[in-house]
Amino acid sequence: MTNHNALISDAKGSIGVAVRVPNQSLFSPGGGRYISIPRKKLVQKLEADPSQTRIHTWIEAMRASSPTRTRPGNISPLPESDEEDEYSSWMAQHPSALTMFEEIAEASKGKQIVMFLDYDGTLSPIVENPDRAYMSEEMREAVKGVARYFPTAIVTGRCRDKVRRFVKLPGLYYAGSHGMDIKGPSKRNKHNKNNKGVLFQAANEFLPMIDKVSKCLVEKMRDIEGANVENNKFCVSVHYRCVDQKDWGLVAEHVTSILSEYPKLRLTQGRKVLEIRPTIKWDKGKALEFLLESLGFANSNDVLPIYIGDDRTDEDAFKVLRNKGQGFGILVSKIPKETSATYSLQEPSEVGEFLQRLVEWKQMSLRGR
């Protein structure tokens, strides 16, 4: 199963619209009960009308990012037995990383594991207020343990400084703004073969523009109850998790209206969040490749990257690993989703359990030498 990002230019508004458009539904014909928007239909809609249709299309995308087990409109929910069959089918393709732990451990023998972790929905639960997305002390200890044995990076859409304050662990690599702002440990790190600090910022020239857009969005969203604008330095996130669904159209309208004045910025979408980013070719997959190179593992066969994430933006990293045929992507999700990940975990608590098992396995391996 493969996702495709269609970068569609709205000629009138000059907005780069990055929409994840599956070529087919989640399951093969005969099982396709999870609805996806056909690529051709979505492109036609975007081209047909440079104003209202664009907004309607984004509302569809916003609804699609709020997964449900019921069909849209007046179609009744799926029978429980059908849900179970579809979930079983999905799990057969993306089995639990806990169940398959021994397989993962076997694949890592003789190789250096490098761990990549998303933050929201992976290390911390998804919460209504993004400023209160704290990770538990148990999770912090699990990440600390992993970082003791393996190079570990936090790769997030958040501002790098903010997520570092959440995680509170030195010795990690932090990649904020979807990998556009990367900084490694300030001290020499035993995992870094090059023994030099890592600092990379892919879009410095966009900072004044991003700041201006952020301030405009704060003003525009002031009267929409529940809307939250977050300046993540190299991108801006507009959270609508707490916005009444009847106001989603107004959120999309404000965002696209402001963005029409900035052709060098594009609009993407995650879990109940719209994100404004520079139109550069950089994402979490590029960040993963950059960090592997910085760690001295470019084109190395002795490395096993593991990337754990829950959102659409993590798919770029999953695809890199799948295309390289090296390492594993692990999707955090309780429901079936199209993904390039190899394995799955249901929620952050399972992520913590997986990390702890990895630490215990490494400790046993060292004792057995």
Swiss-Prot record:
Q: Please tell me whether the keyword Iron is annotated for this protein.
A: no
Q: Name one GO cellular component term.
A: chloroplast
| Reactions listed under catalytic activity | alpha,alpha-trehalose 6-phosphate + H2O = alpha,alpha-trehalose + phosphate
- Biological-process GO terms, alphabetical: response to osmotic stress; response to oxidative stress; response to salt stress; trehalose biosynthetic process
Recorded GO terms, molecular function?
trehalase activity; trehalose-phosphatase activity
Family of this protein? Belongs to the trehalose phosphatase family.
Q: What is this protein called?
A: Probable trehalose-phosphate phosphatase D
Q: Which organism is it from?
A: Arabidopsis thaliana (Mouse-ear cress)
